Amino acid sequence: GQHPYDANHVIIPEIMKANGYQTGMFGKWAGGYEGSASTPDKRGVDEFYGYICQFQAHLYYPNFLNEYNRERGDSAVKRVVMQNNIDYLMFGEQYAQRKDYSADLIHQHALSWLKRQSKGKPFFGVFTYTLPHAELAQPNDSLLAFYKKKFFEDKTWGGQEGSRYNAVDHTHAQFAAMITRLDAYVGEVLRTLDEQGLAENTLVIFTSDNGPHEEGGADPTFFNRDGKLRGLKQQCYEGGIRIPFIARWKGRIKEDVTSDLPFAFYDLMPTFCDVAGVRNFPKRYINKKKTIDYFDGISIFPTLMSDEKAQKKHPHLYWEFAETNQIAVRMGDW
């Protein structure tokens, strides 16, 4: 997450911006540390609010977030200090006194940006909400109280300072409330598109970056989060790499349709180029200064349009997790 994206290779916001799109990103950047060659302001993002620091991104009451607004005239990404947090220690009993909850702040900025979009100019938004990863923490509000009553006998977790996660009571209630909070965020995004009259011309995708984890006291077994799939985050079993992918495009994508097409996130660049009408994007965006440069992705636009016969497929799919020397290859009817 701290390692910068390679500046020699184009990323999706840069392509969208070059083709007339207003670009916004709200949440976790994970594409380079502060001051690196790959921060949102340098990679095609017009407006950003959220985490650039990977360390802070594991906490919901961080010391600071980052923001950038090209229209406002910002010259670079800057820090936004969480004044209601910094007077209290990051680990220990004082942490519970922090008040600036990052998830709500990020969502508020995302909605504000979305409400400023219109039919007159295309827009590309990436809302990388971090809920429910990885710290189990949120305001002690009615939502959390509801789940505390639901789980009468709940699990506690003692905390782990080296991993920066504080002790947690009611871990199941915390997790369930965080999922419900995320669900409410998604509902507000969809409702905003409907109210703005943008739903029929906006593709919305809801997905995740990996399977469930056990960090911070999370208990995926209790919630049966991956059903019958084996494995967790940081593993190459299906439980670690097979994730939800839900798409809505009113009037274009048929409702209540499922697909068993295997694909990967690198297929989204050509897919978004198809959606945006960007033609010949490999030739246009390959770095001609590099001896070897290419795009791995295959557009899944035909599948989104329920045109399975036109859908090209990968001869194989490959995953690896270097920290544990895991490799997986999938070919054919597996």
Identify the role of each PLM range:
Residues 13, 113, 325-331:
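Short, surface-exposed beta-strand/loop micro-motifs that present aromatic residues
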Residues 31, 35, 54-269, 273-294, ...:
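Active-site-proximal cap/lid insertion segments
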Residues 2-5, 233-238, 318-320, 326, ...:
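Short Gly/Pro-enriched turn/cap motifs at secondary-structure boundaries
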Residues 12, 28, 268, 300:
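Short active-site alpha-helical segment characteristic of glycosyltransferases
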Residues 1-25, 34-35, 40-47, 57, ...:
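Active-site segment of extracytoplasmic enzymes that catalyze sulfate/phosphate-ester chemistry
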Residues 48-49, 246:
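Short, well-ordered beta-strand core segments
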Residues 18-24, 43-46, 119-125, 198-204, ...:
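Loop/turn elements at helix/coil->beta-strand transitions in domains of secreted/extracellular proteins
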